[in-house]
Regions:
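Bacterial N-terminal signal peptides
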Residues: 7-17
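Sec/Tat signal peptide C-region and signal peptidase I cleavage site
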Residues: 16-24
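Extracytoplasmic small-molecule ligand-binding "clamshell" domains
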Residues: 24, 31-101, 286-288, 296-299, ...
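Solvent-exposed, polar/charged alpha-helical surfaces in well-ordered, non-transmembrane soluble domains
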Residues: 28, 61-69, 90, 94, ...
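Sec-exported extracytoplasmic/periplasmic mature domains
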Residues: 31-32, 68-76, 93-97, 105, ...
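Bilobed "Venus flytrap"/periplasmic-binding protein-like clamshell domains
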Residues: 37-46, 56-71, 105, 125-181
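Extended ligand-binding regions for polar small-molecule ligands
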Residues: 62-65, 69-71, 134-137, 141, ...
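Acidic, polar ligand-binding/catalytic clefts
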Residues: 65, 69, 73, 77-142, ...
Length: 339
């Protein structure tokens, strides 16, 4: 009887401990260790790339910096884990990272079968093709019989197979796990075509020996909504990551920038006051301070600032806003209201 009671007691204690850990969740873990562990690419200029001093920057990096600003009031409290396409989901599932912000496409399978949640879209992309100008090709429909370089374990690999089959063209896949291996193989002439998300083509072209000798073809063959990913079952962390991105988008729409956010603390616009934490208790609902969005905007900037700084027309990538412009300016970028 005593053994039974002891076993029941131990079982209850273990259940309570497990429940406590589950309740604590990722946000509590992040606060305890003092930083956000962010999964990023192994080097994609404009999105997640480290300079010679190891400082990370990019559109995806800014999401992680925004999360850190919301949690700690300090956007620098982030550590980065470079991951290949094959490694990224396992790293998130295992708890090696807190959030994956790595040019990752939101698909039905990834959202429903891997135990993961996508927290929004920070870049609307589409798959494209890059070739050498000397090939004399002006359309992807002229690529029949080509050798195509791509990454393993990506939607890119699946999309290219669908595209060539749908257009009754033969092709050969030359696939690698790491992006630098793909770029290197293409640069050395091991394949005729390099395919990935179009934003990635512009970014990786900068790494080629003679970047001006290559063109991105006009066809976009897929929808690739890219965004941050978290584990399922932790709604508090999911909400925080989701609303970090939403705050940046809302800030751009309201005209709140890193330069003017201090003056916005006395705005007469109720929506702005809610955004910067002067009205409402939205930070408390997220488990952080009510100045969470103010800190994001002050230290990282709004979505438009992040886009322009990392991938916009004045950067080496030179990407126009296109569909990533605000809904009010001809694009589809849109966030729910903070109210």
């Amino acid at each position: 009887m005593k053994k039974t009671l002891l076993a029941l007691g131990l079982g209850t204690a273990m259940s309570v401990a497990a429940a406590t850990a589950a309740t604590a969740g990722t946000l509590a873990d992040v606060k305890a260790k003092g930083h956000v562990q962010c999964g990023v690419s192994q080097g994609l200029p404009g999105f997640s790339n480290a300079d010679s001093k190891g400082k990370w920057a990019g559109l995806d990096v800014d999401v992680c910096r925004g999360i850190a600003a919301a949690v700690f009031g300090d956007a620098t409290k982030v550590k980065y884990t470079p991951l290949s396409s094959k490694e990224r989901f396992t790293a998130l599932q295992s708890g090696e990272i807190d959030v994956l912000s790595r040019n990752t496409t939101w698909t039905a399978t990834r959202d429903t079968a891997l135990g993961l949640n996508f927290a929004g879209v920070n870049y609307y992309d589409g798959q494209g093709f890059m070739v050498r100008k000397s090939l004399g090709v002006t359309s992807a429909l002229q690529l029949g019989g080509a050798a195509v370089c791509t990454n393993t374990g990506t939607t890119t690999e699946l999309n290219v197979a669908d595209y060539f089959r749908a257009n009754n063209m033969k092709f050969e896949v030359v696939a690698f796990e790491k992006s630098d291996e793909v770029v290197g193989a293409y640069d050395k002439g091991r394949c005729d075509v390099y395919t990935t998300d179009q934003s990635g083509l512009y970014a990786q072209r900068l790494k080629l020996t003679n970047s001006k000798d290559h063109i991105v073809l006009p066809e976009i063959i897929s929808k690739e909504p890219l965004g941050p990913v978290v584990r399922q079952g932790d709604d508090q962390w999911f909400n925080l990551v989701k609303w970090t991105l939403n705050a940046m988008i809302n800030a751009e729409e309201m005209g709140v920038t890193s330069a003017n956010v201090d003056s916005m603390l006395t705005s007469k616009n109720p929506a702005v006051l809610r955004l910067v934490g002067k009205e409402g208790s939205f930070g408390e609902n997220l488990g952080v301070g009510n100045d969470w969005a103010y800190n994001i905007i002050k230290q990282v900037g709004n979505y438009g600032e992040s886009f322009d700084r990392n991938v916009g027309p004045k950067t080496p990538l030179g990407i126009a806003r296109g569909v990533n412009a605000l809904w009010s300016k001809g694009g589809i970028m849109y966030a729910p209201p903070i109210r």
